[in-house]
């Protein structure tokens, strides 16, 4: 508990120092950017007129839809690749092929083939999340200590038992790392997708603000994305601690 409180205190101190440095840089004119007070005032305005809340829900809906779908498919595919050599040989080249293509490069193709509604945005988020998570899951399976597997076989365990009792628990830390990376990829992708083709969302709001050189609104969107991403990452860290207490 003391270590956790110390860590929280250091987190808060780090944020305070960062915001203080930001304030000093803008107040002294060292950088031509809006200060924390200006950004806070704009955030309050956007909250009161409902724009910020609407943008948050629009971006969250897209992120969660694509992220959950991507992770839900990545975990079984990763286990399949790691457990069966034939599946690995069939699937792994395609995974590596698509990993080399930035999901953002797929956006124009997705818009042409899927239309301009929510489908292309969710698809590219799904792709980014899937590719990040599937590799981590696969790596977790093939990294399991062979001694544990051989010991289970000596004790008479069947493949299904070894998979459920040895492979899955040993792979959980790798899976959660992949999920966290996938979450970051999802947020990066949704912002880019909204910059190109959207009528709502935090990325769309930044693109509109750019047209009018509205820096405070751009900063509000950036800070909001950072806060939402940090909160979701902390939830995943809590799940990691709960699932890997052993």
Swiss-Prot record:
Domain ABC transmembrane type-1: 56-236
PROSITE patterns per UniProt: ABC_TM1
GO terms for biological process, alphabetical: transmembrane transport
InterPro entries documented for this protein: MetI-like, MetI-like_sf
Gene3D superfamilies: MetI-like
Localization annotation: Cell inner membrane
Transmembrane segments: 12-32, 63-83, 94-114, 122-142, 172-192, 211-231
Membrane topology classification: Multi-pass membrane protein
UniProt KW keywords: Cell inner membrane, Cell membrane, Membrane, Transmembrane, Transmembrane helix, Transport
Keyword Transport set for record: yes
Cellular component terms per the entry's GO annotation: plasma membrane
Similarity comment: Belongs to the binding-protein-dependent transport system permease family.
Role: Probably part of an ABC transporter complex. Probably responsible for the translocation of the substrate across the membrane.
Assembly with partners or alone: The complex is composed of two ATP-binding proteins (BMEII0108), two transmembrane proteins (BMEII0107) and a solute-binding protein (BMEII0109).
Name by which UniProt lists this protein: Probable ABC transporter permease protein BMEII0107
């Amino acid at each position: 508990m003391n270590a956790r409180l110390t860590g929280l205190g250091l987190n808060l101190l780090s944020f305070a120092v960062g915001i203080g440095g930001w304030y000093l840089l803008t107040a002294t004119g060292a950088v031509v950017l809006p200060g924390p007070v200006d950004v806070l005032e704009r955030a309050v305005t956007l909250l009161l007129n409902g724009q910020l809340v609407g943008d948050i829900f629009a971006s969250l809906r897209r992120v969660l839809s694509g992220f959950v779908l991507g992770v839900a498919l990545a975990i079984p595919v990763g286990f399949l690749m790691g457990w069966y050599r034939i599946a690995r040989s069939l699937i792994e080249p395609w995974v590596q092929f698509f990993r080399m293509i930035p999901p953002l490069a797929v956006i124009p193709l997705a818009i042409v083939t899927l239309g301009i509604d929510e489908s292309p945005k969710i698809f590219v988020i799904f792709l980014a999340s899937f590719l990040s998570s599937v590799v981590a899951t696969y790596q977790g399976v093939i990294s399991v200590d062979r001694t544990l597997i051989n010991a289970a076989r000596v004790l008479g365990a069947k493949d299904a038992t070894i998979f459920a009792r040895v492979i899955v628990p040993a792979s959980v830390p790798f899976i959660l790392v992949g999920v966290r990376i996938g979450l970051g990829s999802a947020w990066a992708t949704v912002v880019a997708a909204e910059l190109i083709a959207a009528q709502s969302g935090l990325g769309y709001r930044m693109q509109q603000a750019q047209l009018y050189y509205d820096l405070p609104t751009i900063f509000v969107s950036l800070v909001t994305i950072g806060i939402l991403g940090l909160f979701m990452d902390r939830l995943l860290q809590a799940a990691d601690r709960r699932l890997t207490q052993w």
